[in-house]
Amino acid sequence: MNGTEGPMFYVPMSNATGVVKSPYDYPQYYLVAPWAYGCLAAYMFFLIITGFPINFLTLYVTIEHKKLRTPLNYILLNLAISDLFMVFGGFTTTMYTSLHGYFVFGRIGCNLEGFFATLGGEMGLWSLVVLAFERWMVVCKPVSNFRFGENHAIMGVVFTWFMACTCAVPPLVGWSRYIPEGMQCSCGVDYYTRAPGYNNESFVIYMFLVHFIIPLIVIFFCYGRLVCTVKDAAAQQQESETTQRAEREVTRMVVIMVIGFLICWIPYASVAWYIFTHQGSEFGPVFMTVPAFFAKSAAVYNPCIYICMNKQFRHCMITTLCCGKNPFEEEEGASTTASKTEASSVSSSSVSPA
């Protein structure tokens, strides 16, 4: 084996020389140089100082502006809450442990950090799935006479919490486990070992199918149908420049949303699956660390894609930050007017990130 398995940990380095020590008790500078841990701590600090303000501002602005408290925006508030879970439950812990070079909070701390980081990440993932599904229902109208209301929005939010818990809770109760991963400064699900009694194999397969493949299929289907619906509406009004402009705007938004999802989850899922199917093979600590923080960075760029790109949210944020005035109001108003369709029931505002 090209790694060292101990009680409740797995270090991706052979202990032939006897240098490997528990990541709960000793600095892991034999894995990578101390400066790499400093870089990791700096990256976590960057995610904290950018992720917290934008997600907190999203919640604050929604409370301040009644027009934002619509059912279609509930899922965006849930997305902001999930990102704050990651900021406080994952980023702050990882920054502190990185400064020490090992997971200083011990086994209980590893369980807590792994749980909150996984819960926040999964809430964000399923929020994107529900967001895509809601837009598909509203725009494509697969169910005739369907009217999206507050009860539907609440059901969507509850669903994201339920699905997140079905991923984050099992490792706490014996189906798989949380252990330090990568550079041993953050904790995640055990993809690395076949530890007796934890059924890691079945849990990893469950996670890959239910919490990656299914969300991927739903998002591609919903946004694919949405783009087709908008294109059909635009084709019926070829003489309308505003309709064509709205179609291009919607298509651009959908492409950005899908690319953001893929950047977030493809690297992590691919590397985790590779490690799971090649247990015992040689791989460095950075191999798992980098994809994990691709997923963590979603707490910063998800709000930029799904909230700041939305004209209504953006306008309210600017007026809140500028003491009730929007210095760009004329530009925002002109852009909003130009993006409306003339006679189509499908508009860019109904399929935009918010």
UniProtKB/Swiss-Prot annotation:
<keyword id="KW-0844">Vision</keyword>
<keyword id="KW-0600">Photoreceptor protein</keyword>
<keyword id="KW-0675">Receptor</keyword>
<comment type="function">
    <text>Photoreceptor required for image-forming vision at low light intensity. While most salt water fish species use retinal as chromophore, most freshwater fish use 3-dehydroretinal, or a mixture of retinal and 3-dehydroretinal. Light-induced isomerization of 11-cis to all-trans retinal triggers a conformational change that activates signaling via G-proteins. Subsequent receptor phosphorylation mediates displacement of the bound G-protein alpha subunit by arrestin and terminates signaling.</text>
</comment>
<keyword id="KW-0325">Glycoprotein</keyword>
<feature type="transmembrane region" description="Helical; Name=2">
    <location>
        <begin position="74"/>
        <end position="96"/>
    </location>
</feature>
<feature type="topological domain" description="Cytoplasmic">
    <location>
        <begin position="309"/>
        <end position="354"/>
    </location>
</feature>
<dbReference type="InterPro" id="IPR019477">
    <property type="entry name" value="Rhodopsin_N"/>
</dbReference>
<feature type="disulfide bond">
    <location>
        <begin position="110"/>
        <end position="187"/>
    </location>
</feature>
<feature type="topological domain" description="Cytoplasmic">
    <location>
        <begin position="62"/>
        <end position="73"/>
    </location>
</feature>
<feature type="lipid moiety-binding region" description="S-palmitoyl cysteine">
    <location>
        <position position="322"/>
    </location>
</feature>
<feature type="topological domain" description="Cytoplasmic">
    <location>
        <begin position="225"/>
        <end position="252"/>
    </location>
</feature>
<feature type="transmembrane region" description="Helical; Name=7">
    <location>
        <begin position="287"/>
        <end position="308"/>
    </location>
</feature>
<keyword id="KW-0966">Cell projection</keyword>
<feature type="topological domain" description="Extracellular">
    <location>
        <begin position="1"/>
        <end position="36"/>
    </location>
</feature>
<feature type="short sequence motif" description="'Ionic lock' involved in activated form stabilization">
    <location>
        <begin position="134"/>
        <end position="136"/>
    </location>
</feature>
<feature type="modified residue" description="N6-(retinylidene)lysine">
    <location>
        <position position="296"/>
    </location>
</feature>
<dbReference type="GO" id="GO:0005886">
    <property type="term" value="C:plasma membrane"/>
</dbReference>
<dbReference type="Pfam" id="PF00001">
    <property type="entry name" value="7tm_1"/>
</dbReference>
<feature type="compositionally biased region" description="Low complexity">
    <location>
        <begin position="334"/>
        <end position="354"/>
    </location>
</feature>
<dbReference type="Pfam" id="PF10413">
    <property type="entry name" value="Rhodopsin_N"/>
</dbReference>
<feature type="lipid moiety-binding region" description="S-palmitoyl cysteine">
    <location>
        <position position="323"/>
    </location>
</feature>
<keyword id="KW-0681">Retinal protein</keyword>
<keyword id="KW-1133">Transmembrane helix</keyword>
<keyword id="KW-1015">Disulfide bond</keyword>
<keyword id="KW-0812">Transmembrane</keyword>
<dbReference type="InterPro" id="IPR001760">
    <property type="entry name" value="Opsin"/>
</dbReference>
<dbReference type="InterPro" id="IPR000732">
    <property type="entry name" value="Rhodopsin"/>
</dbReference>
<dbReference type="GO" id="GO:0016020">
    <property type="term" value="C:membrane"/>
</dbReference>
<feature type="topological domain" description="Extracellular">
    <location>
        <begin position="275"/>
        <end position="286"/>
    </location>
</feature>
<keyword id="KW-0716">Sensory transduction</keyword>
<feature type="glycosylation site" description="N-linked (GlcNAc...) asparagine">
    <location>
        <position position="15"/>
    </location>
</feature>
<feature type="transmembrane region" description="Helical; Name=4">
    <location>
        <begin position="153"/>
        <end position="173"/>
    </location>
</feature>
<feature type="transmembrane region" description="Helical; Name=3">
    <location>
        <begin position="111"/>
        <end position="133"/>
    </location>
</feature>
<keyword id="KW-0564">Palmitate</keyword>
<dbReference type="InterPro" id="IPR050125">
    <property type="entry name" value="GPCR_opsins"/>
</dbReference>
<feature type="topological domain" description="Extracellular">
    <location>
        <begin position="174"/>
        <end position="202"/>
    </location>
</feature>
<comment type="similarity">
    <text>Belongs to the G-protein coupled receptor 1 family. Opsin subfamily.</text>
</comment>
<feature type="transmembrane region" description="Helical; Name=6">
    <location>
        <begin position="253"/>
        <end position="274"/>
    </location>
</feature>
<keyword id="KW-0597">Phosphoprotein</keyword>
<dbReference type="InterPro" id="IPR000276">
    <property type="entry name" value="GPCR_Rhodpsn"/>
</dbReference>
<keyword id="KW-0472">Membrane</keyword>
